[in-house]
Amino acid sequence: MIEPDLETVEPDLAPVGPDLEIEVEQRLLAVFDFDGTITRHDSFVPFLKFAFGQRAFSVRMARLVLPSLGYLAKRLTRDELKGRLIKAFLSGVEVQWLQQKAEAFCQSHWKRLMRPAALESIAAEIEKGAIVTLCSASPAMVLQPFADRLKVQLIGTNLEVIDGKLTGLIEGSNCRCDSKVARLESVYGPLSQFRVRAWGDTRGDHELLAAAQDAHWRLFHPTWRRGRYKGPVNAKLHNPDGNDGPTR
């Protein structure tokens, strides 16, 4: 067999360089925040109201008035307030009961909760062959039916379980800010091996957006509600002004 003379090979037939090989081999990882990004509003508090009923919900929420005031006065952090919320509602709750309520909530609230444009975007990412995952601060148990229906992966805040019952405590950390990136890497490995596309809408998504090659800020919101992105300046946003502008 005659070996080709690489110096005379036409440019379009020349061997692929190392940099191009890396780009070709990179898989797409599409990461969507859940609450407010692909939904019209927060889902966890409405879920609690749905699961427990109006009366029990109101009684438990009344216990959170003082902690909420403490949060507003900056004596409690956001994560601490969320911990109080979870403890007030979910201590001693059976996992099976919560899972059944989550499934029923997904079925009854899907149309009123989900943003149609976001559903189209998720379907498009799946069609491209991307690994698609929801990455949310909401409890994973509550969001699992939504992930199953979307046919995507899920990373969420884990709840501690002992003997089939919730303890009312978070297992690990609340999945927001730096924890989103850490959790993604714990599941998928270094993000540098992927071309990461990310969608978010709050302060809790800034680190995720900064870790992505393609970042989208409140893309599915009505234009008048998007506002200007105020996160890390190194985020490669397509719409830093809340509009579909060029990547910066």
Predicted regions and their residues:
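Residues within well-ordered alpha-helical secondary structure of globular protein domains
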Residues: 50-53, 104, 214
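Active-site neighborhood of HAD-like aspartate-dependent phosphohydrolases
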Residues: 17-74
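Metal-dependent phosphoesterase signature
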Residues: 81-116
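C-terminal cap/substrate-recognition subdomain and adjoining C-terminal extension
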Residues: 1-15, 19, 26-27, 100, ...
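A general structural signal for well-ordered alpha-helical segments in protein cores
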Residues: 44-45, 82, 181
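Conserved active-site and cofactor/substrate-binding residues in soluble primary-metabolism enzymes
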Residues: 42, 93, 179
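Short, compositionally biased "basic patch" segments
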Residues: 69-95, 147-150, 154-158
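Residues at alpha-helix boundaries and short interhelical turns
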Residues: 38, 55, 76, 92, ...
